Amino acid sequence: QKTAYEIYQCDWSSDVCSSDLTLLVSYIPDSVSDADVVIKALSESLESANFPLRESLIVVANRWRSLICADALCCPMEGQPLPAFEQARVTAEQISLGNPLPYRNAEDLRQSLERFDVDEEIESEITTIPEVADSETAQKRRQEGAEALIDFINDFESDGICRDKKLIAIILVRMKDLQVRDFALGSVTHERLNLYFDAYKWLMRMAPQNYVAPIATVFSAVCYEKGEGVMAQRVLDRALSDDPDYALAHLFRQFFATGRKPEIFADMRKELHPKVCDAIFSGTLQR
């Protein structure tokens, strides 16, 4: 076990080293009786490392109190009950910043990725749209798919939803083509990562059976780049459930398991996306 001072001597980030004050929060199991000894030693170590202690809180048996506050009305010895997570001020602040609440368990996460209710209009539209295939019209169909993706993102950015069922159907059918799928993957930008995260998740949940794997695999990469590694794996579960032989999903599963930095996707886009655009639009697409 390292003291706070020994930790301080390690490779702290510049943000931590530049901190003016410290907040110490100690979560104590019900069965522990000598926590005050550890907390006192840790507090003294922080002070000696030039991290002034602004507040020290203990949390035990779903109650909390301050070790610094001397007001018995504010911080009685028995502590105050913890607020409900959904009602806490920090929860409201995070939601206002666009950050979703964490999932309570793996089942909640899985359910958040499941398909929405069946949309019969989309399924009907899908039957009218031919796949790209290798034909004289393949290039035109790929262009149609890429342009539909651009329109979809614009709609989603404006309204948080896409109401054009024909457009959604075109995307889902065209993304069975590898070039259109790669265009969707390469269109993501770090500056608009949250937009693509929300849009591709929504599109995946709209997709009927046999059309999930391409969009789910693309969405898994966005999850990974966003730092949502567990979600990325669960999204791949959906992709492989839809198509057990989907090659890119298997490749991403192996890649995610290596724990490599998410930034690698930005590097890949920078190198590959211009080539994909050129292949689809013959260099005519201006981005």
Describe each PLM feature range.
Residues 13-14, 19-258, 262-287:
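Charged, compositionally biased boundary regions
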Residues 1-17:
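Single conserved hydrophobic/aromatic residue that forms the stacking wall/gate
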